[in-house]
Curated annotation (Swiss-Prot):
The keyword tRNA processing does not apply. One of its GO terms (molecular function) is tRNA binding. Binds directly to 23S rRNA. The L1 stalk is quite mobile in the ribosome, and is involved in E site tRNA release. Protein L1 is also a translational repressor protein, it controls the translation of the L11 operon by binding to its mRNA. GO terms for cellular component: large ribosomal subunit. Coiled coil: none annotated. CDD domains: Ribosomal_L1. One of its GO terms (biological process) is translation. Gene3D superfamilies: 3.30.190.20, 3.40.50.790. Part of the 50S ribosomal subunit. Belongs to the universal ribosomal protein uL1 family. This is Large ribosomal subunit protein uL1.
């Protein structure tokens, strides 16, 4: 049975949610600057939420020529600690460790993956290790962790790949419904830093438009914060 203190907390929490929602008009369109300001003022959670973007495109990712996928280096980073695993031959392990890799090795990492122990956010591999990694492709692939040369995670330049992963590189990939979703920093970032990240991400995804696509590309865009409000962006305000 709830006591008076529990009831008071629930009422207080509900009031904060209502007040937050009142600060955002559900039927309004915002430019990026106003959207960031509104989301900050409407946030009520006690942790540092992530600024999230959802973009709806007029594509059908089931067709290979309409797949939209790539990576973006966010100027202000993501605000998250990224654990990087590097799968390489023994002679390059020290280089990977010196560059900041959290996990380094070859068959030892493969064995951990097979055992269900995936303690990393990004997996980087040298080209000569791809045959070995193929044995865990069905495990890493669905999790978005399979090294890919198009994403810069299959490379001879281990140092730069680790630097990019650690400094705020974000991968994007269109889902079945033509939707791309990504986290672009913490709401505690300055407005300027969040806008830098937003502009860099939006520019990269728009440039990734499939060459043979007919009709409009970007259909809708929304910004939100973790457990917070969502606002729709006025596409005419996107340069």
């Amino acid at each position: 049975m709830s006591n008076k203190k529990d009831v008071a907390v629930k009422i207080s929490g509900g009031k904060k949610i209502r007040e937050a929602r009142e600060k955002v008009k559900s039927d309004a369109l915002y430019n990026l600057t106003n959207a960031v300001e509104r989301l900050k003022s409407a946030s009520y959670v006690k942790f540092d939420p992530t600024l999230e973007i959802v973009m709806k495109f007029g594509i059908d990712p089931r067709h290979s020529d309409q797949m939209v996928r790539g990576v973006v280096n966010l100027p202000a980073g993501t605000g998250k600690t990224v654990r990087v695993a590097v799968i390489c031959k023994e002679e390059r392990e020290e280089e990977a460790k010196s560059a900041g890799a959290d996990l380094v090795g070859s068959t030892n990492i493969i064995d951990e993956i097979k055992a269900g122990k995936i303690n990393f956010d990004v997996c980087i591999a040298t080209p000569d290790m791809m045959a070995v990694i193929g044995s865990v492709a069905r495990i890493l692939g669905p999790k978005g962790l399979m090294p890919n040369p198009k994403l810069g995670t299959v490379t001879l330049d281990i140092k730069n790949a680790i630097k990019n992963a650690k400094s705020g590189q974000v991968e994007y990939r269109a889902e079945k419904a033509g939707i791309i979703h990504a986290g672009l920093g913490k709401l505690s970032f300055s407005d300027q830093d969040l806008l830098k990240n937003l502009n860099a991400f939006i520019e990269a995804v728009i440039k990734a438009k499939p060459a043979g696509l007919k009709g409009s590309y970007l259909k809708a865009m929304y910004l939100s914060s973790t457990m917070g409000a969502s606002v729709q962006i006025d596409l005419t305000s996107i340069a």
